[in-house]
């Protein structure tokens, strides 16, 4: 299979937060202390289990750590290898799974600042989606307004399944914020896992999800 034409845009690149420690510099004192004192280990979701063969190409997995956590390797394998002009980072961290609205907001901010500093500042071909905490749409709207001034953030990221259908009025503040900042809303496969992902209950196999 030949490479795509030069100038292609990869609309779904998944940089991985290597560990919760990577986000500590981007949390305020309260949440940093909470993570340390409570021994919070990780906030990864189960959307892409590390041991699942289809979560990442075997040859892209490092010997230690997660696929997608290293910019140098990602640059070589996902950008240079395909002649990619731009790539949009969709960071699928566990922000949407948290029950505490304030904690979810703090981690959404941390993830966005981490992406900007550790990825966008270091690779001019990268763009990113704004990670929001839909648990509180007003918080999510505030985060959109905060990050939209950085034009390297090109859309708002939401998961296809949240606590309720995304068309509910509850989420309208998020859509208003996206609209006033001229940003599309990108809906990615995934779930907050509050409810079964099908109308007839939980699936048996990961592929069904």
Walk through the language-model features, giving the residues of each.
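Helix-coil boundary/capping segments in enzymes
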Residues: 1-209
């Amino acid at each position: 299979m030949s490479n795509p034409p030069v100038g292609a845009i990869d609309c779904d690149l998944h940089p991985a937060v290597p560990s919760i420690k990577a986000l500590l510099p981007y949390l305020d004192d309260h949440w940093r202390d909470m993570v340390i004192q409570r021994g919070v280990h990780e906030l990864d979701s189960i959307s892409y289990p590390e041991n699942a063969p289809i979560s990442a190409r075997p040859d892209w997995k490092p010997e230690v750590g997660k696929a997608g956590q290293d910019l140098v390797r990602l640059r070589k394998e996902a950008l240079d290898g395909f002649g990619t002009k731009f790539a949009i980072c969709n960071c699928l961290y566990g922000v949407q799974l948290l029950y505490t609205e304030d904690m979810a907001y703090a981690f959404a901010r941390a993830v966005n600042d981490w992406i900007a500093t550790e990825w966008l500042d270091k690779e001019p071909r990268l763009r990113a989606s704004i990670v929001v905490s839909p648990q509180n749409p007003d918080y999510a709207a505030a985060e959109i307004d905060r990050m939209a001034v950085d034009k390297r953030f090109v859309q708002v990221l939401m998961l296809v399944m949240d606590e309720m259908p995304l068309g509910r009025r509850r989420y309208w503040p998020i859509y208003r914020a996206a609209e006033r900042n001229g940003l599309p809303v990108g809906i990615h496969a995934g779930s907050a896992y509050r409810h079964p992902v099908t109308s007839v209950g939980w699936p048996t196999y990961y592929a069904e999800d």
